[in-house]
Structures are given as structure tokens and as C-alpha cells.
Amino acid sequence: MESIEEFEKRLGYRFQNKNLLIEALTHKSYKKPYNNERLEFLGDAVLDLVIGEFLFLKFPKADEGELSKMRASLVNEKGFAKLAERVSLGRHIFISNAEENNKGREKPSLLSNAFEATMGAIYLETGLSVVREVVHRLLDEVYPKIDLGSLFRDYKTALQELTQAKFGETPEYVILGSSGPDHKKEFEVAVCVLGSEYARACGSSKKEAQQEAARIALEIFHRKEKEAKESALKGKSE
């Protein structure tokens, strides 16, 4: 197994407090008095800011809506897992034997959480400037030809992957109606999961409306996940 020093070298940052790094790499399954959940919570907020800043500087002509969509395509489990893979983070996480046997080192969720926690740990030790340097460098390495088009996600596919993983079900899209003249029609679509409406949106085509509804639904799912994490952490501290 590679040393922590090798990981730090790839990361481009050497921790003064190694215990902080070890905590960031420790999954809750490892059964220690500590795990990386609190650092993950902090890192999530830090990454939201520095990735937003990266896009703001990279695309001076992009409007707020475009920047928000691009950030949503990077600030998520899949995006963070890609950055984690870039520094071979999976080799260094501390997990239980059960997780090891279940290929836990390759799971996007574990990689994403540990990456968030590691960024939270760097922030605690040195502040925002070093996190910014590390993350901006990794983004340039992972997305060398980043542009507006390449960052817009297929939200329908992303939502389907999420709902199949969580519920074993695929989303259903319902056309609620259309308005406007034939040359400038607008369609309204609702996306339903397990029979319940999660979001609705409008677009100049059915496909565009479905993509926007899927994007909103993804935001709702991610917000609920974040709120659940915050609630769980609050419960543990009380």
C-alpha cells in the first residue's frame, strides 16, 4: 500500500497535522471514534465556493443561469469522484473489511465523500487559498478542454441513474400541456418518481422541458440529502 506521503504528493499539499488527514480518509464503517462525516460537511461548502469561483473566472461571458448549470454538473458525487480518482484517493481511505470486499475503494459515493472531507481538512489547516489552488489545478487536469457545451449534463440520464440506485425505479415524464403559436410553442412537463411529482418545468421543446424538470428534480434530491446529513450530524452532537 502506498504511503500517505505519496498521496500528499499527488494532491499537491502536505499536511502539518497528519491526524486531520487520517480523519478525512476514514469512512464510518472503519469503526473508529472518529470518521470523515463532519469534514465532508465542511468540504462540501468550500468546494461549492471554489468551483463556482473557477467557473466565474473561466467563463467571463457566461450568464448566471449558465454558471449555475455548469456548477451543478461539477458539484456532485460523480464530479467529486472524478477529482478523487485523479489523485488515487481510493488507495488511501480507511474502510471496513465488508466495504473492502464490496469494492468500497471504487464506489463513487465513498470517493466523493472522502474528497470533500480532504478539502475540508485542508481548509481547516490553511484556509481557502490553498483549497483554491488544489481544486483549480485538479479541474484543469481533469477537464483540460473545458467549455460551456461539455459541462452541460444530460440531466435525464443523471436522474434516472439516481432513482434506479435509490428506489429501483425510473422517472416518468408527463406532458402537462403546451401554449403559444406553432412557430413558438412552449411545453410544460412534470417529472414523477414513485408516482409523486417532484418537479415541473417549461421549454421550447418537450426534450428541453424534460431536461429542465430533471435538473430541478436533481437539485431537490441533492438538497434533501444535504439536509439529511446536517440533521444526522446535529443529532449526533446533541
Curated annotation (Swiss-Prot):
The annotated active site, in chain numbering, is D44, E116
Question: Which reaction equations make up its catalytic activity?
Answer: Endonucleolytic cleavage to 5'-phosphomonoester
**Domain DRBM, residue spans:** 154-223
Keyword entries, A-Z: Cytoplasm, Endonuclease, Hydrolase, Magnesium, Metal-binding, mRNA processing, Nuclease, RNA-binding, rRNA processing, rRNA-binding, tRNA processing
In terms of Gene3D superfamilies, this protein maps to: 3.30.160.20, Ribonuclease III domain
| PROSITE patterns documented for this protein | DS_RBD, RNASE_3_1, RNASE_3_2
Its EC number is 3.1.26.3
Highest taxon listed in the record's lineage: Bacteria
Q: Which GO terms describe its biological process?
A: mRNA processing; regulation of gene expression; rRNA processing; tRNA processing
Pfam families recorded = dsrm (PF00035), Ribonucleas_3_3 (PF14622)
Matching entries from CDD domains are given as: DSRM_RNAse_III_family, RIBOc
Q: Mind telling me which InterPro entries this protein's record contains?
A: dsRBD_dom (IPR014720), RNase_III (IPR011907), RNase_III_dom (IPR000999), RNase_III_sf (IPR036389)
Annotated binding of Mg(2+), by residue = E40, N113, E116
Q: Name one GO molecular function term.
A: metal ion binding
One of the record's GO cellular component terms:
cytoplasm
Ranges of residues in domain RNase III = 4-127
Name what cofactor the protein needs. Answer: Mg(2+)
| Quaternary structure and interacting proteins, as annotated | Homodimer.
Similarity comment text for this entry: Belongs to the ribonuclease III family.
Function in brief: Digests double-stranded RNA. Involved in the processing of primary rRNA transcript to yield the immediate precursors to the large and small rRNAs (23S and 16S). Processes some mRNAs, and tRNAs when they are encoded in the rRNA operon. Processes pre-crRNA and tracrRNA of type II CRISPR loci if present in the organism.
Q: Which NCBIfam families match?
A: RNaseIII (TIGR02191)
This chain belongs to which protein, by name? Ribonuclease 3
Q: Which organism is it from?
A: Wolinella succinogenes (strain ATCC 29543 / DSM 1740 / CCUG 13145 / JCM 31913 / LMG 7466 / NCTC 11488 / FDC 602W)
